[in-house]
């Protein structure tokens, strides 16, 4: 069976695989969009958030490939400044190596129809140090923006058997994060993992809540930085 893609479209499938859902994060710490101006949401025209994303320049959003696979992009818009501004999508693409079963290469780009004057964040090109602290910014069940503190776990360690995953599951385009708060759970796919003020990961999948020995699995952004750079130029 396919892994969990923390996505509301797949809640029925996800219930069979994991207890992470897109109902919203639990256990996060309240934050503000001014602290994370680069965080955006992919949402329906009714305002319902389906995925997170992050601005890497004034018109380009990085998000998870699953978000463009499981939703009709023509029916999505991008919420900027925590939804205060809604921008149409001009074009989009996802990594051609994205695999529905393994969740390998779970990364995509969205080009906005107009530039936005908010903060952006740099894409990390070097692997984060194992054990470094990071933060996931996402929304809780009440639609409040929250931070979830994470301890970053590298690819080889996460798949070593010390946690819930085998080396066959944690592939080279993935890294993991263990929630610092034992009660933290859930996040929208595509929500950014930031460490050292750079984008190092995107929420992708997991078998648990990212805690109690069950790390959340993220798209490993440094391993896909070249694809992001080249694709953003041609999008």
For the regions a language model picked out, list residue spans one by one:
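Protease-domain processing segments flanking chymotrypsin-fold serine proteases, especially trypsin-like
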Residues: 1-62, 70-82, 161-162, 173-174, ...
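Conserved catalytic-core segment of clan PA serine endopeptidases
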Residues: 24-27, 75-116
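Extracellular collagen-like Gly-X-Y triple-helix signature, i.e., selective recognition
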Residues: 195, 201-235
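Active-site-proximal beta-strands of protease catalytic cores
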Residues: 60-65, 130-141, 194-208
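Catalytic nucleophile loop of clan PA
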Residues: 54-55, 129, 181-204
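Chymotrypsin/trypsin-fold serine protease catalytic domain
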Residues: 92, 107, 112-113, 118-180, ...
């Amino acid at each position: 069976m396919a892994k969990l893609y923390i996505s509301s479209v797949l809640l029925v499938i996800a219930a069979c695989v994991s207890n992470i859902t897109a109902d919203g994060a639990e256990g996060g710490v309240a934050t503000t969009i001014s602290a994370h101006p680069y965080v955006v949401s992919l949402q329906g025209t009714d305002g319902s958030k389906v995925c997170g994303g992050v601005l890497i320049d004034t018109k380009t959003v990085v998000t998870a490939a699953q978000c463009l696979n499981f939703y009709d992009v023509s029916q999505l818009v991008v919420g900027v400044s925590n939804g205060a501004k809604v921008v149409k999508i001009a074009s989009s693409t996802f990594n051609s190596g994205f695999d529905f079963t393994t969740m390998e290469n779970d990364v995509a780009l969205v080009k906005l129809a107009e530039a936005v004057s908010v903060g952006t964040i740099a894409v990390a090109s070097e692997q984060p140090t194992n054990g470094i602290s990071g933060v996931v910014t996402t929304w809780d069940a009440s639609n409040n923006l929250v931070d979830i503190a994470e301890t970053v776990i590298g690819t080889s360690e996460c798949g070593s058997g010390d946690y819930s995953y085998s080396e066959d599951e944690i592939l080279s385009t993935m890294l993991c994060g263990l929630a610092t708060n034992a009660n933290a759970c859930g996040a929208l796919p595509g929500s950014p993992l930031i460490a050292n003020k750079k984008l190092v990961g995107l929420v992708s999948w997991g078998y648990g809540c990212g805690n109690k020995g069950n790390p959340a699995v993220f798209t490993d952004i440094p391993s896909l930085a070249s694809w992001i750079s080249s694709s953003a130029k041609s999008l």
